[in-house]
Amino acid sequence: MELPPGPRDDPHAWDDDSDPELEPDTDAQAEAYVARLLSPPKLGLAPPRAPPLPAPTVSFGSLEPRAASKGPTVAVPGLLSLPPELLLEICAYLDARLVLHVLPRVCHALRDLVRDRVTWRLRAQRRVRAPYPVVEEEDFDWPTACIELEQHLSRWADDGRRAEYFCLADGHFASIDSVLLLQGGTLCLSGSRDRNVNLWDLQQLGVEPSRVLVKTLGTQKNSTHKGWVWSLAALDHRVCSGSWDSTVKLWDMAADGQQFGEIKGKAAVLCLSYRPDILVTGTYDKKVTVYDPRVGPALLKSRRLHSSAVLALLADDRHIISGSEDHTLVVFDRRANSVLQRLQLDSYLLCMSYQEPQLWAGDNQGLLHVFANRSGCFQLVRSFDVGHRSQITGIKHSLGALYTTSTDKTIRVHVPTDPPRTICTRSHHNVLNGICAEGNLVVAASGGLSLEVWRLQA
């Protein structure tokens, strides 16, 4: 049955401000609401009406409903009544990810405590008990660093006994010199002196061993390249491989690893860096060459920046950084199109890992070097002996982890403190030529024709 329109249905009635009634006392209404709906009833007696109260001076927080009690109400101190120092001590026993992502949803007090950068700095330094990070930065991401540190320490606890180990020895018939993880560590590429680039599906580890090796890239009958494959680099699903045959080949992993481009140079390609707008090569003829991978790839410029072969290379939006056998580290300013710095070193760099502002590099004497990017100027700030007895061939640095490989036949796992603390060492029967870490996978390239794989706790 449809009711006839009433005064509340009149759209103009809500615009009338001439109501002579006094505005209600909202505090009194709240008190009455709590008393009426949330107080325990008494059997046989009608609840007496509370006399009108004067305007209270307490906040609405004091009027929140409380659990019914037969006796007089007693204030019981809660967790939030503890001093911040005790709350932090309790949080120290909780997983860092839970503290960062869950506790802020509980209440404002915990949110403010968790968002304090000092909270995470103290937590991280308590975990590592050493100067960290090696390069101080104003906007250092302490929460993320703390999560990575704790995860890294947990994964490699007890000398790495929790990590699953796999040896992939059936894909190449010569030394493997480069390795690259893709798609969060689910796929792996390896470049070898057998002139091939192999694609591996690491999701099949321990499930279907015969399906781990997916294919060899390329359409040539015998091999991917006509020379040793020495370097690999990737941008999203696009990959490039550099070879001693003086070519760089480009592959589309989203198209089943089909080749979509080739660069023919004049010297062996020893190192690569792949950016959205440039592809950079370091070659045996002492040159650093820049291509536009979006067109062609088209040659943009080539400079002889060194007096010996270019062995290590990386690039970001502002710089191209190259290390050479001539014992120099050259910083090229992309915007000014000129050399910004040329640093003379006592050794030559074989590998580099960069996460601004920290540049970590391994040299031919088994030492680690840390350079700091300070306002676009790179400075050598620290050098470390982490136990390697010969050349460091691979390095992977992140906020909370540090991995190195060497021709001394070891892979070493460190915490990136000052100095680095080695928490695990794995020995191999042959030299190790490089390393890559992504997600929960760590893969090392071996001169013994194999890929050495460690699957860590997720």
Curated annotation (Swiss-Prot):
WD repeats lie at residues 171-210, 224-261, 264-301, 305-342, 344-381, 387-424, 427-458. Gene3D superfamilies: 1.20.1280.50, YVTN repeat-like/Quinoprotein amine dehydrogenase. The modification Phosphoserine is found at S18, S59. SMART domains: FBOX, WD40. The modification N-acetylmethionine is found at M1. Residues 16-28 have a biased composition (Acidic residues). The keyword Mitochondrion does not apply. Interacts with SKP1 and CUL1. Substrate-recognition component of the SCF (SKP1-CUL1-F-box protein)-type E3 ubiquitin ligase complex. This is F-box/WD repeat-containing protein 9.
